[in-house]
């Protein structure tokens, strides 16, 4: 019987360890997917406009001429916009719980026939029960993030309402690895400044990813066994 229980315990630990290894490996694979020259982040080529026939025979084509008084804001597929990264978040949370409960129950002396209290060795029969429980919990969390810089992105698509879908990435090759920034989202044309820049807090549905690859990034990554002990799979 003891050998059977021991075998079941070993099986349970083996399954838990296998799940932890699988989870750790899946996280590693997810991080390694970010590689340079990703086709999903390839440069967007401008759409080719159909050549319009000018019936007058003139060589002047107003459709391809930019007004000298017009601004240089991006508004077509393939145009480039500079996004100024100015992200800062701060979150604080405090939780405090204190519970107290006290119960007390007394039973009067047991009486017999004629209302005479029943006694044993001269002591009357009576009962008393009391219970006292206390619980106190205190939790505090404080987290902050900031990201500054700039990245140039392409206009991926022009929506029917005039909004622009943007996408782009920037890779920095360092001695011990690569650092990259990726950004996707939707912006309004009127939020673009006259110098063709826009703040990152004006980007709707923004997905900003800043990470790195290489030995420097690996040194800051927890091992799979450490992840297991810090995960919810660890029962203690």
UniProtKB/Swiss-Prot annotation:
* Coiled-coil region: none
Q: Tell me its family.
A: Belongs to the FlgH family.
Native source organism of the sequence: Colwellia psychrerythraea (strain 34H / ATCC BAA-681) (Vibrio psychroerythus)
Matches recorded under NCBIfam families:
PRK00249.1-4, PRK12698.1
Q: Which UniProt keywords apply?
A: Bacterial flagellum, Cell outer membrane, Lipoprotein, Membrane, Palmitate, Signal
Q: Which PANTHER family match?
A: FLAGELLAR L-RING PROTEIN
Q: Which gene encodes it?
A: flgH
Q: Which GO terms describe its cellular component?
A: bacterial-type flagellum basal body, distal rod, L ring; cell outer membrane
Q: What does this protein do?
A: Assembles around the rod to form the L-ring and probably protects the motor/basal body from shearing forces during rotation.
Full protein name: Flagellar L-ring protein
Lipidation sites (N-palmitoyl cysteine): 25
Membrane topology recorded in Swiss-Prot or TrEMBL: Lipid-anchor
């Amino acid at each position: 019987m003891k050998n059977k229980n021991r075998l079941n315990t070993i099986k349970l630990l083996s399954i838990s360890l296998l799940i932890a290894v699988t989870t750790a490996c899946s996280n590693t694979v997810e991080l390694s997917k970010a590689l340079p020259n990703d086709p999903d982040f390839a440069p967007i080529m401008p759409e080719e406009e159909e050549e319009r026939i000018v019936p007058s025979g003139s060589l002047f084509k107003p459709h391809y001429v930019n007004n000298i008084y017009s601004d240089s804001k991006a508004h077509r597929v393939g145009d480039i916009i500079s996004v100024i990264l100015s992200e800062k978040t701060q979150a604080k949370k405090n939780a405090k719980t204190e519970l107290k409960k006290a119960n007390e129950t007394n039973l009067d002396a047991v009486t017999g026939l004629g209302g005479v209290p029943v006694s044993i060795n001269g002591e009357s029969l009576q009962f008393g029960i009391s219970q006292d429980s206390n619980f106190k919990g205190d939790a505090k969390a404080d987290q902050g993030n900031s990201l500054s810089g700039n990245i140039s992105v392409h206009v991926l698509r022009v929506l029917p309402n005039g909004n622009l879908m943007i996408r782009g990435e920037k890779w920095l090759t360092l001695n011990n690895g690569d650092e990259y920034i990726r950004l996707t989202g939707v912006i309004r044309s009127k939020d673009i400044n006259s110098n063709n820049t826009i703040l990152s807090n004006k980007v709707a549905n923004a997905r900003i990813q800043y990470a790195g690859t290489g030995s420097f990034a690996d040194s800051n990554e927890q091992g799979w066994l450490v992840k297991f002990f810090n995960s919810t799979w660890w029962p203690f």
